[in-house]
Amino acid sequence: MMSHTETSLGAENTRTHNFITQIIDEDLASGKHKSVHTRFPPEPNGYLHIGHAKSICLNFGLAKEYQGLCNLRFDDTNPVKEDVEYVDSIKADVEWLGFKWEGEPRYASDYFDALYGYAVELIKKGLAYVDELSPDEMREYRGTLTEPGKNSPYRDRTIEENLALFEKMKNGEFAEGKASLRAKIDMASPFMVMREPVIYRIKFSSHHQTGDKWCIYPMYDFTHCISDAIERITHSICTLEFQDNRRLYDWVLENISIERPLPHQYEFSRLNLEGTLTSKRKLLKLVNDEIVDGWNDPRMPTISGLRRRGYTPASLREFCRRIGVTKQDNVVEYSALEACIREDLNENAPRAMAVIDPVRVVIENFESEAVLTAPNHPNRPELGERQLPFTKELYIDRADFREEANKQYKRLVLGKEVRLRNAYVIKAERVEKDANGEITTIFCTYDPETLGKNPADGRKVKGVIHWVSAVNNHPAEFRLYDRLFTVPNPGAEDDIESVLNPNSLVIKQGFVEQSLANAEAEKGYQFEREGYFCADSKDSRPEHLVFNLTVSLKEGF
Protein backbone atom coordinates (compact mmCIF):
# COMPACT_ATOMS: atom_id res chain seq x y z
CA MET A 1 0.00 0.00 0.00
CA MET A 2 1.05 3.54 -0.64
CA SER A 3 1.47 5.69 2.46
CA HIS A 4 1.08 9.44 2.59
CA THR A 5 4.50 10.58 3.73
CA GLU A 6 4.53 13.59 1.44
CA THR A 7 5.13 17.28 1.51
CA SER A 8 2.32 19.72 2.07
CA LEU A 9 -0.07 20.99 -0.58
CA GLY A 10 1.21 23.47 -3.07
CA ALA A 11 3.11 21.38 -5.62
CA GLU A 12 0.24 21.46 -8.12
CA ASN A 13 2.06 23.47 -10.74
CA THR A 14 5.25 21.42 -10.77
CA ARG A 15 6.09 19.49 -13.94
CA THR A 16 4.81 15.91 -13.82
CA HIS A 17 6.91 12.96 -14.96
CA ASN A 18 5.38 9.61 -15.82
CA PHE A 19 5.30 7.14 -18.69
CA ILE A 20 2.54 9.11 -20.46
CA THR A 21 4.41 12.43 -20.35
CA GLN A 22 7.45 10.57 -21.67
CA ILE A 23 5.38 9.31 -24.64
CA ILE A 24 3.97 12.79 -25.28
CA ASP A 25 7.44 14.36 -25.12
CA GLU A 26 8.68 11.84 -27.70
CA ASP A 27 5.63 12.38 -29.95
CA LEU A 28 6.09 16.15 -29.93
CA ALA A 29 9.86 15.92 -30.45
CA SER A 30 9.48 13.54 -33.42
CA GLY A 31 6.76 15.63 -35.03
CA LYS A 32 4.22 12.80 -34.79
CA HIS A 33 1.89 15.33 -33.18
CA LYS A 34 2.17 19.11 -33.18
CA SER A 35 0.01 19.55 -30.09
CA VAL A 36 -1.77 17.55 -27.39
CA HIS A 37 -5.51 16.88 -27.46
CA THR A 38 -6.99 14.63 -24.75
CA ARG A 39 -10.51 13.85 -23.60
CA PHE A 40 -12.42 12.75 -20.51
CA PRO A 41 -15.16 10.37 -21.72
CA PRO A 42 -17.52 9.25 -18.91
CA GLU A 43 -20.69 7.27 -19.51
CA PRO A 44 -23.62 9.22 -17.96
CA ASN A 45 -24.97 6.23 -16.03
CA GLY A 46 -24.00 7.30 -12.52
CA TYR A 47 -22.20 9.94 -10.50
CA LEU A 48 -18.44 10.33 -10.84
CA HIS A 49 -16.32 8.83 -8.06
CA ILE A 50 -12.81 9.34 -6.72
CA GLY A 51 -11.40 7.06 -9.45
CA HIS A 52 -12.81 9.40 -12.09
CA ALA A 53 -11.10 12.30 -10.32
CA LYS A 54 -7.76 10.67 -11.14
CA SER A 55 -8.72 10.43 -14.83
CA ILE A 56 -10.04 14.01 -14.87
CA CYS A 57 -6.86 15.38 -13.30
CA LEU A 58 -4.72 13.34 -15.69
CA ASN A 59 -6.48 14.26 -18.94
CA PHE A 60 -7.19 17.91 -18.15
CA GLY A 61 -3.82 18.22 -16.41
CA LEU A 62 -1.91 16.98 -19.47
CA ALA A 63 -3.80 19.40 -21.71
CA LYS A 64 -2.94 22.27 -19.38
CA GLU A 65 0.69 21.23 -18.99
CA TYR A 66 1.26 20.98 -22.75
CA GLN A 67 -0.94 24.01 -23.58
CA GLY A 68 -3.27 21.69 -25.44
CA LEU A 69 -6.98 20.90 -25.35
CA CYS A 70 -9.18 18.48 -23.44
CA ASN A 71 -12.72 17.55 -24.47
CA LEU A 72 -15.54 16.45 -22.21
CA ARG A 73 -17.35 13.72 -24.12
CA PHE A 74 -20.27 11.68 -22.86
CA ASP A 75 -20.05 8.09 -24.10
CA ASP A 76 -23.82 7.81 -24.25
CA THR A 77 -24.39 4.61 -26.22
CA ASN A 78 -26.70 2.82 -23.76
CA PRO A 79 -29.98 4.76 -23.35
CA VAL A 80 -31.37 2.23 -20.85
CA LYS A 81 -28.95 3.19 -18.06
CA GLU A 82 -28.27 6.84 -18.84
CA ASP A 83 -29.95 10.02 -17.69
CA VAL A 84 -29.68 13.80 -17.99
CA GLU A 85 -29.30 13.91 -14.18
CA TYR A 86 -25.95 12.16 -14.57
CA VAL A 87 -24.92 14.43 -17.46
CA ASP A 88 -25.54 17.51 -15.32
CA SER A 89 -23.78 16.08 -12.26
CA ILE A 90 -20.70 15.15 -14.31
CA LYS A 91 -20.42 18.65 -15.77
CA ALA A 92 -20.76 20.14 -12.28
CA ASP A 93 -18.09 17.81 -10.86
CA VAL A 94 -15.54 18.59 -13.58
CA GLU A 95 -16.05 22.35 -13.15
CA TRP A 96 -15.93 22.09 -9.35
CA LEU A 97 -12.59 20.27 -9.59
CA GLY A 98 -11.30 23.35 -11.39
CA PHE A 99 -11.25 22.29 -15.03
CA LYS A 100 -12.83 23.64 -18.22
CA TRP A 101 -13.34 21.53 -21.30
CA GLU A 102 -12.68 22.66 -24.86
CA GLY A 103 -15.78 24.17 -26.48
CA GLU A 104 -19.17 22.65 -25.76
CA PRO A 105 -19.57 19.24 -24.11
CA ARG A 106 -19.58 16.53 -26.74
CA TYR A 107 -21.69 13.40 -26.95
CA ALA A 108 -20.97 10.13 -28.73
CA SER A 109 -24.60 10.43 -29.84
CA ASP A 110 -23.56 13.49 -31.87
CA TYR A 111 -21.81 10.99 -34.13
CA PHE A 112 -24.58 8.37 -34.49
CA ASP A 113 -25.08 9.18 -38.19
CA ALA A 114 -21.34 8.97 -38.86
CA LEU A 115 -21.04 5.76 -36.83
CA TYR A 116 -23.85 4.18 -38.82
CA GLY A 117 -22.01 5.13 -42.01
CA TYR A 118 -18.79 3.51 -40.80
CA ALA A 119 -20.71 0.35 -39.89
CA VAL A 120 -22.10 0.24 -43.43
CA GLU A 121 -18.55 0.70 -44.75
CA LEU A 122 -17.38 -2.34 -42.76
CA ILE A 123 -20.27 -4.39 -44.17
CA LYS A 124 -19.36 -3.32 -47.72
CA LYS A 125 -15.75 -4.38 -47.09
CA GLY A 126 -16.92 -7.79 -45.88
CA LEU A 127 -15.78 -6.94 -42.35
CA ALA A 128 -19.15 -6.96 -40.56
CA TYR A 129 -22.26 -9.12 -40.71
CA VAL A 130 -25.74 -9.29 -39.22
CA ASP A 131 -25.98 -12.20 -36.80
CA GLU A 132 -29.19 -13.78 -35.54
CA LEU A 133 -27.70 -15.92 -32.80
CA SER A 134 -29.37 -15.30 -29.44
CA PRO A 135 -27.19 -13.79 -26.69
CA ASP A 136 -26.96 -17.22 -25.02
CA GLU A 137 -25.97 -18.92 -28.28
CA MET A 138 -23.40 -16.21 -28.93
CA ARG A 139 -21.80 -16.88 -25.54
CA GLU A 140 -21.72 -20.60 -26.33
CA TYR A 141 -20.10 -20.00 -29.73
CA ARG A 142 -17.53 -17.62 -28.27
CA GLY A 143 -15.32 -20.32 -26.77
CA THR A 144 -13.09 -19.91 -23.71
CA LEU A 145 -9.62 -18.67 -22.90
CA THR A 146 -8.31 -22.16 -23.73
CA GLU A 147 -10.68 -23.12 -26.56
CA PRO A 148 -11.29 -21.24 -29.82
CA GLY A 149 -14.77 -20.04 -30.68
CA LYS A 150 -17.00 -21.30 -33.49
CA ASN A 151 -18.16 -19.32 -36.49
CA SER A 152 -21.79 -18.24 -36.46
CA PRO A 153 -23.96 -19.97 -39.08
CA TYR A 154 -24.89 -16.44 -40.25
CA ARG A 155 -21.26 -15.37 -40.77
CA ASP A 156 -21.14 -16.03 -44.51
CA ARG A 157 -24.10 -13.95 -45.58
CA THR A 158 -23.49 -11.85 -48.68
CA ILE A 159 -22.71 -8.16 -48.45
CA GLU A 160 -26.08 -7.41 -50.03
CA GLU A 161 -27.92 -9.54 -47.45
CA ASN A 162 -26.08 -7.86 -44.58
CA LEU A 163 -26.79 -4.37 -45.90
CA ALA A 164 -30.49 -5.18 -46.22
CA LEU A 165 -30.68 -6.79 -42.77
CA PHE A 166 -28.80 -3.92 -41.12
CA GLU A 167 -31.28 -1.52 -42.72
CA LYS A 168 -34.10 -3.63 -41.26
CA MET A 169 -32.46 -3.46 -37.83
CA LYS A 170 -32.30 0.33 -38.17
CA ASN A 171 -35.97 0.48 -39.21
CA GLY A 172 -37.13 -1.47 -36.16
CA GLU A 173 -38.07 -4.65 -38.03
CA PHE A 174 -36.27 -6.93 -35.54
CA ALA A 175 -37.14 -7.36 -31.87
CA GLU A 176 -34.50 -6.71 -29.20
CA GLY A 177 -32.01 -9.56 -28.97
CA LYS A 178 -33.05 -11.04 -32.32
CA ALA A 179 -30.26 -9.55 -34.43
CA SER A 180 -26.97 -7.71 -34.01
CA LEU A 181 -24.15 -6.44 -36.18
CA ARG A 182 -20.80 -8.13 -35.51
CA ALA A 183 -17.28 -7.34 -36.63
CA LYS A 184 -15.84 -10.09 -38.85
CA ILE A 185 -12.38 -10.76 -37.44
CA ASP A 186 -11.34 -14.19 -36.10
CA MET A 187 -13.26 -16.55 -33.81
CA ALA A 188 -9.99 -18.36 -33.04
CA SER A 189 -8.19 -15.22 -31.85
CA PRO A 190 -6.35 -15.72 -28.55
CA PHE A 191 -7.88 -12.39 -27.50
CA MET A 192 -11.53 -12.75 -26.53
CA VAL A 193 -12.25 -9.13 -27.46
CA MET A 194 -11.33 -9.94 -31.08
CA ARG A 195 -13.73 -12.88 -31.42
CA GLU A 196 -16.15 -11.03 -33.64
CA PRO A 197 -17.63 -8.64 -31.07
CA VAL A 198 -21.07 -7.09 -31.43
CA ILE A 199 -20.72 -3.53 -32.71
CA TYR A 200 -24.45 -2.65 -32.97
CA ARG A 201 -27.42 -3.94 -30.96
CA ILE A 202 -31.15 -3.24 -30.91
CA LYS A 203 -32.68 -1.24 -28.02
CA PHE A 204 -36.16 0.23 -28.20
CA SER A 205 -35.37 2.91 -25.63
CA SER A 206 -35.69 6.66 -25.82
CA HIS A 207 -32.29 8.37 -25.70
CA HIS A 208 -31.70 11.46 -23.54
CA GLN A 209 -30.11 13.31 -26.48
CA THR A 210 -31.58 11.79 -29.65
CA GLY A 211 -35.05 10.84 -28.44
CA ASP A 212 -36.62 8.05 -30.50
CA LYS A 213 -34.63 8.60 -33.70
CA TRP A 214 -32.67 5.37 -33.26
CA CYS A 215 -33.53 1.84 -32.19
CA ILE A 216 -30.04 0.51 -32.87
CA TYR A 217 -27.10 1.70 -30.80
CA PRO A 218 -23.36 1.25 -31.33
CA MET A 219 -21.31 -0.59 -28.71
CA TYR A 220 -18.69 1.23 -26.64
CA ASP A 221 -15.68 -0.37 -28.36
CA PHE A 222 -16.92 0.65 -31.81
CA THR A 223 -17.96 4.14 -30.74
CA HIS A 224 -15.05 5.16 -28.58
CA CYS A 225 -12.23 4.89 -31.09
CA ILE A 226 -14.22 6.57 -33.88
CA SER A 227 -15.25 9.42 -31.55
CA ASP A 228 -11.57 9.93 -30.67
CA ALA A 229 -10.66 10.06 -34.36
CA ILE A 230 -13.50 12.45 -35.25
CA GLU A 231 -12.40 14.81 -32.45
CA ARG A 232 -8.73 14.53 -33.50
CA ILE A 233 -7.68 13.23 -30.09
CA THR A 234 -3.92 12.61 -30.04
CA HIS A 235 -3.61 10.59 -26.83
CA SER A 236 -6.58 8.47 -25.76
CA ILE A 237 -5.92 7.58 -22.13
CA CYS A 238 -7.91 4.97 -20.23
CA THR A 239 -7.49 2.45 -17.41
CA LEU A 240 -5.76 -0.91 -17.64
CA GLU A 241 -8.90 -3.02 -17.94
CA PHE A 242 -9.18 -1.69 -21.51
CA GLN A 243 -5.69 -2.89 -22.47
CA ASP A 244 -6.94 -5.81 -24.61
CA ASN A 245 -9.63 -3.58 -26.12
CA ARG A 246 -6.85 -1.56 -27.74
CA ARG A 247 -6.58 -4.32 -30.37
CA LEU A 248 -10.19 -3.73 -31.35
CA TYR A 249 -9.71 0.06 -31.10
CA ASP A 250 -6.91 -0.16 -33.68
CA TRP A 251 -8.71 -2.72 -35.87
CA VAL A 252 -11.81 -0.54 -36.26
CA LEU A 253 -9.84 2.60 -37.12
CA GLU A 254 -7.49 0.84 -39.52
CA ASN A 255 -10.45 -0.58 -41.47
CA ILE A 256 -12.54 2.55 -42.01
CA SER A 257 -11.99 5.63 -44.15
CA ILE A 258 -11.23 8.22 -41.48
CA GLU A 259 -8.70 11.02 -41.37
CA ARG A 260 -5.14 10.12 -40.40
CA PRO A 261 -3.06 10.22 -38.25
CA LEU A 262 -5.11 7.92 -36.06
CA PRO A 263 -5.34 8.36 -32.30
CA HIS A 264 -3.59 5.84 -30.07
CA GLN A 265 -4.82 4.40 -26.79
CA TYR A 266 -2.64 4.30 -23.66
CA GLU A 267 -3.57 2.61 -20.39
CA PHE A 268 -2.75 3.47 -16.78
CA SER A 269 -3.66 1.79 -13.50
CA ARG A 270 -7.03 2.68 -12.04
CA LEU A 271 -7.32 4.05 -8.52
CA ASN A 272 -7.91 1.38 -5.89
CA LEU A 273 -8.62 3.18 -2.64
CA GLU A 274 -8.64 1.16 0.56
CA GLY A 275 -12.07 0.58 2.07
CA THR A 276 -14.04 2.10 -0.81
CA LEU A 277 -16.31 0.85 -3.53
CA THR A 278 -16.18 2.22 -7.08
CA SER A 279 -18.52 -0.16 -8.90
CA LYS A 280 -21.36 2.02 -10.25
CA ARG A 281 -23.69 -0.97 -10.07
CA LYS A 282 -22.97 -1.53 -6.37
CA LEU A 283 -23.06 2.18 -5.58
CA LEU A 284 -26.44 2.41 -7.32
CA LYS A 285 -27.69 -0.44 -5.13
CA LEU A 286 -26.65 1.48 -2.00
CA VAL A 287 -28.64 4.47 -3.28
CA ASN A 288 -31.70 2.49 -4.39
CA ASP A 289 -31.83 0.47 -1.16
CA GLU A 290 -31.61 3.77 0.79
CA ILE A 291 -28.56 2.57 2.70
CA VAL A 292 -27.11 6.00 1.97
CA ASP A 293 -28.70 9.41 1.46
CA GLY A 294 -28.32 9.53 -2.32
CA TRP A 295 -25.28 9.69 -4.58
CA ASN A 296 -23.92 12.69 -2.65
CA ASP A 297 -24.10 11.08 0.79
CA PRO A 298 -20.88 12.21 2.54
CA ARG A 299 -19.89 8.56 3.06
CA MET A 300 -19.98 7.84 -0.67
CA PRO A 301 -16.74 7.84 -2.71
CA THR A 302 -18.43 10.05 -5.31
CA ILE A 303 -16.97 13.46 -6.07
CA SER A 304 -20.27 15.03 -5.00
CA GLY A 305 -20.22 12.99 -1.78
CA LEU A 306 -16.66 14.05 -0.97
CA ARG A 307 -17.63 17.65 -1.77
CA ARG A 308 -20.60 17.48 0.62
CA ARG A 309 -18.32 15.89 3.22
CA GLY A 310 -16.08 18.96 3.03
CA TYR A 311 -13.28 17.91 0.71
CA THR A 312 -11.91 20.74 -1.42
CA PRO A 313 -11.01 20.68 -5.13
CA ALA A 314 -7.39 21.46 -4.23
CA SER A 315 -7.19 18.49 -1.84
CA LEU A 316 -8.49 16.05 -4.47
CA ARG A 317 -6.16 17.42 -7.14
CA GLU A 318 -3.25 17.10 -4.73
CA PHE A 319 -4.25 13.54 -3.86
CA CYS A 320 -4.27 12.62 -7.55
CA ARG A 321 -0.88 14.28 -8.01
CA ARG A 322 0.64 12.35 -5.12
CA ILE A 323 -0.56 8.91 -6.17
CA GLY A 324 0.82 9.49 -9.66
CA VAL A 325 0.30 7.62 -12.91
CA THR A 326 1.73 4.14 -13.43
CA LYS A 327 0.92 0.86 -15.15
CA GLN A 328 1.10 -1.08 -11.86
CA ASP A 329 -2.07 -1.73 -9.89
CA ASN A 330 -1.77 -0.94 -6.21
CA VAL A 331 -4.01 -0.11 -3.29
CA VAL A 332 -3.78 3.40 -1.88
CA GLU A 333 -4.32 3.82 1.85
CA TYR A 334 -7.39 5.87 2.73
CA SER A 335 -5.19 7.88 5.09
CA ALA A 336 -3.39 9.28 2.02
CA LEU A 337 -6.64 10.95 0.92
CA GLU A 338 -7.34 12.18 4.45
CA ALA A 339 -3.84 13.64 4.73
CA CYS A 340 -4.48 15.88 1.71
CA ILE A 341 -7.69 17.42 3.05
CA ARG A 342 -6.26 17.68 6.56
CA GLU A 343 -3.25 19.65 5.30
CA ASP A 344 -5.45 21.89 3.16
CA LEU A 345 -7.86 22.70 5.98
CA ASN A 346 -5.13 23.10 8.58
CA GLU A 347 -3.63 25.80 6.39
CA ASN A 348 -6.82 27.48 5.20
CA ALA A 349 -9.79 26.73 7.46
CA PRO A 350 -10.85 29.34 10.01
CA ARG A 351 -11.06 28.16 13.62
CA ALA A 352 -14.23 28.05 15.68
CA MET A 353 -15.56 26.34 18.79
CA ALA A 354 -18.30 23.75 18.94
CA VAL A 355 -19.49 21.57 21.80
CA ILE A 356 -20.73 18.27 20.45
CA ASP A 357 -21.69 16.51 23.70
CA PRO A 358 -22.55 19.42 26.00
CA VAL A 359 -22.71 19.64 29.76
CA ARG A 360 -23.62 22.91 31.53
CA VAL A 361 -21.06 24.95 33.43
CA VAL A 362 -22.04 27.75 35.86
CA ILE A 363 -19.30 30.22 36.84
CA GLU A 364 -20.54 31.29 40.24
CA ASN A 365 -18.31 34.34 40.72
CA PHE A 366 -18.90 35.78 37.23
CA GLU A 367 -21.91 38.09 37.27
CA SER A 368 -21.56 40.21 34.15
CA GLU A 369 -21.10 39.45 30.45
CA ALA A 370 -17.93 39.97 28.45
CA VAL A 371 -17.12 39.93 24.76
CA LEU A 372 -13.74 38.36 24.11
CA THR A 373 -11.88 38.20 20.79
CA ALA A 374 -10.11 35.28 19.19
CA PRO A 375 -8.10 34.92 15.96
CA ASN A 376 -9.82 33.12 13.10
CA HIS A 377 -6.53 31.37 12.36
CA PRO A 378 -3.44 31.20 14.60
CA ASN A 379 -1.02 31.65 11.68
CA ARG A 380 -3.10 33.76 9.29
CA PRO A 381 -3.69 37.22 10.80
CA GLU A 382 -5.18 38.35 7.47
CA LEU A 383 -8.20 36.13 8.22
CA GLY A 384 -9.13 38.49 11.05
CA GLU A 385 -10.74 37.95 14.44
CA ARG A 386 -14.13 36.96 15.78
CA GLN A 387 -16.06 37.89 18.89
CA LEU A 388 -16.78 35.36 21.63
CA PRO A 389 -19.50 36.24 24.15
CA PHE A 390 -18.38 35.01 27.59
CA THR A 391 -21.26 34.45 30.00
CA LYS A 392 -21.98 33.09 33.47
CA GLU A 393 -23.32 29.87 31.96
CA LEU A 394 -21.30 27.94 29.39
CA TYR A 395 -21.21 24.55 27.76
CA ILE A 396 -18.17 22.31 27.67
CA ASP A 397 -17.84 18.83 26.25
CA ARG A 398 -18.83 16.05 28.65
CA ALA A 399 -15.57 14.21 27.90
CA ASP A 400 -13.63 17.24 29.19
CA PHE A 401 -14.69 16.77 32.83
CA ARG A 402 -14.08 14.06 35.41
CA GLU A 403 -14.76 13.99 39.10
CA GLU A 404 -11.53 12.06 39.61
CA ALA A 405 -8.63 11.60 37.21
CA ASN A 406 -4.98 10.64 36.98
CA LYS A 407 -2.18 13.05 36.07
CA GLN A 408 -2.38 12.18 32.37
CA TYR A 409 -5.86 13.72 32.15
CA LYS A 410 -5.21 17.38 31.24
CA ARG A 411 -8.78 18.63 31.35
CA LEU A 412 -11.21 19.81 34.02
CA VAL A 413 -11.24 17.77 37.24
CA LEU A 414 -13.24 18.41 40.40
CA GLY A 415 -11.18 20.66 42.67
CA LYS A 416 -8.68 21.52 39.94
CA GLU A 417 -8.14 24.16 37.27
CA VAL A 418 -8.15 24.28 33.49
CA ARG A 419 -7.93 27.08 30.95
CA LEU A 420 -10.88 27.84 28.71
CA ARG A 421 -9.67 28.40 25.14
CA ASN A 422 -9.20 32.14 24.39
CA ALA A 423 -10.58 32.96 27.86
CA TYR A 424 -9.98 32.50 31.60
CA VAL A 425 -8.79 29.82 33.98
CA ILE A 426 -11.66 28.12 35.82
CA LYS A 427 -11.80 25.72 38.76
CA ALA A 428 -14.44 23.01 39.24
CA GLU A 429 -15.95 23.35 42.72
CA ARG A 430 -18.93 20.95 42.78
CA VAL A 431 -21.40 19.12 40.55
CA GLU A 432 -25.13 18.55 40.36
CA LYS A 433 -26.56 15.23 39.16
CA ASP A 434 -29.93 13.92 38.06
CA ALA A 435 -31.78 10.90 39.48
CA ASN A 436 -29.69 8.56 37.32
CA GLY A 437 -26.41 9.91 38.62
CA GLU A 438 -25.68 11.78 35.38
CA ILE A 439 -23.90 15.11 35.85
CA THR A 440 -26.18 17.96 34.75
CA THR A 441 -24.20 21.00 35.95
CA ILE A 442 -20.61 21.73 36.92
CA PHE A 443 -20.25 24.70 39.26
CA CYS A 444 -16.98 26.59 38.84
CA THR A 445 -15.15 29.74 39.79
CA TYR A 446 -12.93 31.75 37.48
CA ASP A 447 -9.74 33.76 37.97
CA PRO A 448 -10.42 37.24 36.48
CA GLU A 449 -6.66 37.95 36.19
CA THR A 450 -5.97 35.12 33.73
CA LEU A 451 -7.35 36.43 30.44
CA GLY A 452 -4.50 35.94 27.99
CA LYS A 453 -1.93 35.37 30.73
CA ASN A 454 -0.82 32.87 33.34
CA PRO A 455 -1.90 33.10 37.00
CA ALA A 456 0.00 35.85 38.79
CA ASP A 457 1.13 33.58 41.64
CA GLY A 458 2.97 31.26 39.23
CA ARG A 459 0.74 28.19 39.63
CA LYS A 460 0.75 25.90 36.61
CA VAL A 461 -2.46 25.29 34.66
CA LYS A 462 -1.68 22.69 32.00
CA GLY A 463 -4.95 21.83 30.30
CA VAL A 464 -6.93 23.85 27.75
CA ILE A 465 -10.52 23.01 26.78
CA HIS A 466 -13.01 24.59 24.39
CA TRP A 467 -16.41 26.01 25.31
CA VAL A 468 -19.46 27.83 24.00
CA SER A 469 -21.66 30.38 25.76
CA ALA A 470 -24.90 28.80 27.00
CA VAL A 471 -26.71 32.07 26.23
CA ASN A 472 -25.19 33.32 22.97
CA ASN A 473 -24.88 30.26 20.78
CA HIS A 474 -26.59 28.34 18.01
CA PRO A 475 -27.89 24.80 18.42
CA ALA A 476 -26.40 22.47 15.82
CA GLU A 477 -26.58 18.92 14.59
CA PHE A 478 -23.24 17.19 14.15
CA ARG A 479 -22.94 14.28 11.74
CA LEU A 480 -19.88 12.28 12.67
CA TYR A 481 -18.99 10.28 9.58
CA ASP A 482 -16.72 7.27 9.46
CA ARG A 483 -15.90 4.77 6.74
CA LEU A 484 -18.89 3.09 5.16
CA PHE A 485 -17.35 -0.40 5.21
CA THR A 486 -15.51 -2.47 7.79
CA VAL A 487 -13.20 -4.27 5.35
CA PRO A 488 -10.31 -3.00 3.18
CA ASN A 489 -11.78 -4.35 -0.08
CA PRO A 490 -15.60 -4.19 0.00
CA GLY A 491 -15.74 -4.67 -3.78
CA ALA A 492 -14.63 -8.29 -3.31
CA GLU A 493 -17.63 -9.10 -1.10
CA ASP A 494 -20.67 -10.82 -2.58
CA ASP A 495 -22.93 -9.25 0.03
CA ILE A 496 -21.76 -5.70 0.63
CA GLU A 497 -24.48 -5.12 3.22
CA SER A 498 -22.76 -7.67 5.47
CA VAL A 499 -19.66 -5.45 5.70
CA LEU A 500 -21.40 -2.11 6.26
CA ASN A 501 -20.07 -0.16 9.23
CA PRO A 502 -23.00 0.30 11.67
CA ASN A 503 -21.23 3.38 13.06
CA SER A 504 -20.52 5.07 9.73
CA LEU A 505 -22.83 7.88 10.84
CA VAL A 506 -23.33 9.02 14.43
CA ILE A 507 -25.54 12.08 14.97
CA LYS A 508 -25.03 14.39 17.96
CA GLN A 509 -26.87 17.50 19.10
CA GLY A 510 -24.83 20.35 20.54
CA PHE A 511 -23.92 24.00 20.16
CA VAL A 512 -21.63 26.20 18.08
CA GLU A 513 -20.34 29.67 18.76
CA GLN A 514 -22.33 32.66 17.56
CA SER A 515 -19.99 33.47 14.64
CA LEU A 516 -21.20 30.35 12.79
CA ALA A 517 -24.81 31.53 12.46
CA ASN A 518 -24.46 31.92 8.70
CA ALA A 519 -21.84 29.26 8.01
CA GLU A 520 -21.46 28.87 4.26
CA ALA A 521 -22.26 25.41 2.88
CA GLU A 522 -19.18 23.27 2.18
CA LYS A 523 -16.83 25.85 3.72
CA GLY A 524 -14.35 24.09 5.99
CA TYR A 525 -13.83 24.99 9.65
CA GLN A 526 -11.57 23.60 12.28
CA PHE A 527 -13.70 23.05 15.35
CA GLU A 528 -10.94 23.35 17.90
CA ARG A 529 -10.02 20.06 19.56
CA GLU A 530 -12.85 18.28 17.67
CA GLY A 531 -11.98 18.03 13.98
CA TYR A 532 -12.57 19.63 10.61
CA PHE A 533 -16.23 20.23 9.74
CA CYS A 534 -18.35 21.92 7.10
CA ALA A 535 -21.98 23.03 6.95
CA ASP A 536 -24.05 20.44 5.09
CA SER A 537 -25.05 21.70 1.64
CA LYS A 538 -28.36 19.84 1.64
CA ASP A 539 -29.79 20.15 5.15
CA SER A 540 -28.07 23.02 6.97
CA ARG A 541 -29.92 26.33 7.28
CA PRO A 542 -29.71 29.22 9.77
CA GLU A 543 -32.58 27.91 11.91
CA HIS A 544 -31.19 24.35 11.86
CA LEU A 545 -27.42 24.20 11.48
CA VAL A 546 -25.97 20.86 10.38
CA PHE A 547 -22.22 20.22 10.32
CA ASN A 548 -20.49 17.25 8.73
CA LEU A 549 -17.24 15.84 10.08
CA THR A 550 -14.80 16.05 7.17
CA VAL A 551 -11.74 14.55 8.83
CA SER A 552 -10.22 14.22 12.29
CA LEU A 553 -7.51 16.59 13.50
CA LYS A 554 -4.92 13.82 13.50
CA GLU A 555 -4.55 10.53 11.67
CA GLY A 556 -6.28 7.73 13.57
CA PHE A 557 -7.65 10.21 16.11
Curated annotation (Swiss-Prot):
GO terms for molecular function: ATP binding; glutamine-tRNA ligase activity. ATP binds at residues 43-45, 49-55, 239, 270-271. The keyword Repeat does not apply. GO terms for cellular component: cytosol. It catalyses: tRNA(Gln) + L-glutamine + ATP = L-glutaminyl-tRNA(Gln) + AMP + diphosphate. Its main location: cytoplasm. A motif ('KMSKS' region) lies at residues 277-281. The gene is glnS. SUPFAM superfamilies: Nucleotidylyl transferase, Ribosomal protein L25-like. This is Glutamine--tRNA ligase.
